[in-house]
Amino acid sequence: MGRAFEYRRAAKEKRWDKMSKVFPKLAKAITLAAKDGGSEPDTNAKLRTAILNAKAQNMPKDNIDAAIKRASSKEGNLSEITYEGKANFGVLIIMECMTDNPTRTIANLKSYFNKTQGASIVPNGSLEFMFNRKSVFECLKSEVENLKLSLEDLEFALIDYGLEELEEVGDKVIIRGDYNSFKLLNEGFESLKLPILKASLQRIATTPIELNDEQMELTEKLLDRIEDDDDVVALYTNIE
């Protein structure tokens, strides 16, 4: 399954170091959402979700407010761009970026791939068909229980809102649906008054691959360089 950058980073970095790197990416998502749909979360579902995700990462309110205000300034001139690449061992990579300078972004990404023998950026559209786009929501199991709902009740309640799969992972419940069902699923959570812990649009590989430890170690070097770029807000691979 393709993995978004925040899940991989959480496993390999300390909490404060993680925060220092994730905040700029979260701020960009908030700024772009406010620029596209207005600065009022009540009428802008994309902004509401971006703020929710920022709060889940303990981003301070002042940072969130500043990111919203930035949408009306020159600093808010951001665009969303996706790039694709290949690495050794059959690894496929999709990079979702938010940038105010696409020339800088692609130059940086190319430099990371050029430092890795056998890796290269490929034309957009070359790999996209090998990933399914999904809406993914997370909530706490305890919040479901607070509503006097079983997981079966929750699944039944959200089917009409586009739910395709429900999975229990530790103390969390993961809800997946079609990419185009994101807004509808969000409305489903709101109708149930069930707090969302995190919400995102993800790319999941149709044919995931497995790497051995040595292959993974070599591949991680490239993935780490990409993830550390402030313009990259999400990274997906076909690694199991």
UniProtKB/Swiss-Prot annotation:
> A single GO BP annotation from the record?
regulation of DNA-templated transcription
Identify the GO cellular component terms for this protein.
cytosol
Per UniProt, the keywords (alphabetical) are: Cytoplasm, DNA-binding, Transcription, Transcription regulation
Give its localization. Answer: Cytoplasm
The record's Pfam families line, in alphabetical order, gives: TACO1_YebC_N (PF20772), Transcrip_reg (PF01709)
Any one GO molecular-function label of the UniProt entry? DNA binding
The record's family statement is: Belongs to the TACO1 family.
User: By what name is this protein known?
Assistant: Probable transcriptional regulatory protein HPG27_148
Organism name:
Helicobacter pylori (strain G27)
